[in-house]
Amino acid sequence: MKTATITDSGSKPERKRSGILAGLSNLPIVNFLTSHSKKVTDSDGAEQESTLEGKIENLSMNFKNSAKGSNMHNALHISPYFIPGMQLGDILFTIAAVVAHSRRINVDCRIPWAYSEVTRELHAALGINALQSTLCGANEALAYEEESYLYTPIPETVSSGGLCGYFQSGNYFAGIEPIIRHLFAPLTAVDKTPGTVGIHITIGNDPYKYSKYRLCTALFLQKAAARLSKDIREVVVFSDKPCEAMAMLVEMPEFSKYSFRADSHKGCEQLHHMTSMQELVISNSALSWWAAWLGKPRKVIAPRCWFMHKAEQPPVFEDSPWIVL
């Protein structure tokens, strides 16, 4: 059995705002970046070593240099206004919502790619698919703030500046799904790994998440096991605390017939690996939601209760083939 290094995702720092930011006070954050070395080939055919951190550092400099002496940033445009503590899944929802709004009102969409390690890693992973950067890759002036976690259409009068929120609903980009899939295509695995099910389990140590989101229960996982296809042989565990998550599953009789493996990837690489699973059991997690939506696995099993508050529903399951328990 393989184990993985445990990295706690942390929580969010104090911010004094209304709307969607009002509940995010007194919450510390730790951003992380996973190093990944790979070979690249120069024009002479020689291999040279390159790291993701190096790419990100160069991209950050490019954001600053590209803004000098250029008038392109004066054109009317909107952009995501990222919030401290946002992780990859949150950022993808925000980008998708703002891209969709920009198309509805016919203005450009630019992204503050230099905002954090997570956004810089995402920019590097998207490559040529990445949208144009904001000035110096930073957040722009706040123009709109999401009122709550419920789906609320963005007013068409919002035609410039930064749009702040989590926008965790597929309704925000309904009608342009092919465009969003193309934009995020580099994050998606081409092939599936036969006989695998990816199970995402959030253990958590964040008091805000404990009060806001329902964590996966043993009962949910037991019900999910009963829905897996007969040809599934291996469980790949994706978690903020993979050792604890795997220990939970191993003790359940429903999973006794499977072999187990803990995924050790982070960020974009973890998302890419999740999309290669033949089937997925997702948690109350934006990242695993995107893995299911982008990866289109044969079967997706998702929790019905996403938030602790009954009035707030999970990101759109309507007209979905997902199995909701």
Predicted feature residues:
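Donor-binding and catalytic core of enzymes assembling or modifying cell-surface/extracellular glycoconjugates
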Residues: 88, 228-303, 308-309
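Secretory-pathway luminal glycosyltransferase catalytic domains
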Residues: 45, 54-55, 59-78, 114-232
